[in-house]
Amino acid sequence: MKKDFNFLTLALGVVLAATSVHAQTGARATGATPATRAQTVAAANLLASLPASEAVMSVDVRRLLSDALPRAYNNNPAELARINAEIDKFKASTGLDARTIERLVVGVSYQQTATGKTLVETVALARGNFRAASFAPSKSRMQEQKYAGKTIQVFNVDTQVKLIGLFNMRVTDVAVAMLDANTVAVGKLERVRAAIDASAGRGRVSPEITALATRDANALVGMGGNIPASLTQNLDMGNISKSIASVRQFYSTLGTTANGFNMLTALRTENAGAAQSLSTMITGLKQLAPFALGQMPAARQRPLRTLVDNSKVGAEGNDVLITLELAQVDVAALIDAF
């Protein structure tokens, strides 16, 4: 059976669930080696090239493909073949091959409609070894236009594809523009235009936002951003809503260990009192988790129980802190269960 649930879905899903759940303390980049410092600089420089965004994410794609994904899927040939098929599908549609990307950053903006619905708009900047001439897909319709001296190719994809074949941000119309010899912008047309402006120094993302995503020099994935009031103001869960609405920012990292993976997310609230209240609420929900898990199929109960048991919750200043460490076999079991 084809699964839309994948390792990145797991990672990002736990982080998003942490908007009522996950974290760890500040920067863990102490004792950074020259190599990790170089990684931090590379991530920060590419993130700084994003257009204005409410939240950002940085991914070490080379490590993701060569190490993290094979480990997360326990080197399952069928699952790894499925991932490669998704990568090839996006390549066939746009000409962009994830295997040529070294690092990817994503900028997210929120747009509220007149009806109060919040729309999420994304743009990705990929840095790697590729050529503009390679963007010549055979299975999609393409239009070309000029903007601020750059060429934008807009592809109409016949079927929905994952962004670069890895991320569950499914797109049908994909705009692609080379920003320089080694950097390409991918996303909705309006956001790609904004990325072109940002590459020229206009309307860039706030340094405060990018700093949240680069707290850990060794992270496989780092992310951070603001939590707009529009995302939480309509929650109707009593005191729980009040606690969640106190969150102003978040940051999170996903890393690898000798035996598996670790994750952190910090939920930054408006004051220390709010952080303590939210921490207490999450701890209470964690204690109730076994009752909810008992209603699930047995195949899902065990990996989810391991996830809950291995998470730790606390408060430090204005931050709610939650850590999670999972062995490789537990990550593989969680993915397999979904």
What do the predicted segments below correspond to?
Residues M1-L10:
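Bacterial N-terminal signal peptides that target proteins for export
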Residues Q24-L166, R170, A213-S243, L278-N310, ...:
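Structural boundary/hinge residues at secondary-structure and domain interfaces
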Residues M57, T122-A126, R248-L254, N259-L267, ...:
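One face of beta-strands
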Residues A229, N239, Y251-G273, S277-A289:
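Small-residue helix/turn framework positions
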